[in-house]
Amino acid sequence: MKLITALGAGKYEPVTYRWNDRTYETSFVQEAFVHWLKPEVTCVLLTEKARETHWNNLCQRLQEHTQIVEVDIPDGKSEAELWRIFEKISDAVCEGDQIAFDITHGFRSLPVIALLTIAYLKQIKQVKVRYILYGAFDAKDEQGTPVFDLTPFADLLDWLAAAKIFTATGDSSELGQLIQEIQNDAYRNREAYGENLPRALKNFGAALAEVSDDLLLARVPNLPKSVSNLIEKQKQASAEVSQWAPPLRLLLDKIATAYAPFQDDSLSTQAALIRWYFKHNHIMQAMTLAREWVVSYHLHKEGRDWRSRKEREQMEKRLGDSLQQDSLWSKIAEIRND
């Protein structure tokens, strides 16, 4: 693991830092984090003033426990300097790193820059953010100074991206992956959570992914079953969503509204699905289903079994032979072939 921390230039006082059931007394919160997290590498962001004031003291405390990397940064007094800090942090992180970010000290804009940098690095360098920690000196009480774990707030950026994809395209597979990862992470860190672990989130996430696959691959016959399964899994997971995945709570109604109409395979449902495909710009799926729907409609109109393969083949031949070139069938076939 790689710890990224900023050294401030202000006054440091000995305090007892408290994180869950762990405590550590020190003047430097970085020392507590190194003691708890045991990072192989610790990157310390240093302004010139911080180097002059505290660097030697901090270095002596850390050097026997972790490899120290000095990262000189400007004071952050201009937009150009803030971009320079962003670049410095990005350069300090390697492809695939697992990182912990300490935002206790430094300039006031550090938390914002940290979150944006993390979002960038997760996408570009595939880093894994293990922790974002803040030693809340202002919240000190008789038990010590609490350390807040702000990691879930960085995950908001992932939820934002997944929600945008769902809203724009109807694809909820990214949401499904995030939900499943929450349960996986909880079980990997079960010592911290005890017996209070999510048990329905993973099935809900898998059901979301299954519906998305059926929609995007136009597996229309599978949709009623997969959508009904999703609705059931959503009900089972609703309480856990509120506790473990708060960003998803606001989307639950939208998910149900988007997919619930596809719980049967009637012709009216398929017509609604064609409109859904067009609305979300899935033109190929829309035209493919529209062509099948025209066949189904004519068979249904004549009182024949529109699910029978033999009947469908015969109707397709009739439509192809008898309808005029400017007919709906012809237009759909032309667009589909394009």
Summary of predicted features, one role per range:
Residues 99-116, 331:
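Elongated alpha-helical scaffolds
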Residues 1-98, 119-338:
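Long, low-complexity, Lys/Arg-enriched
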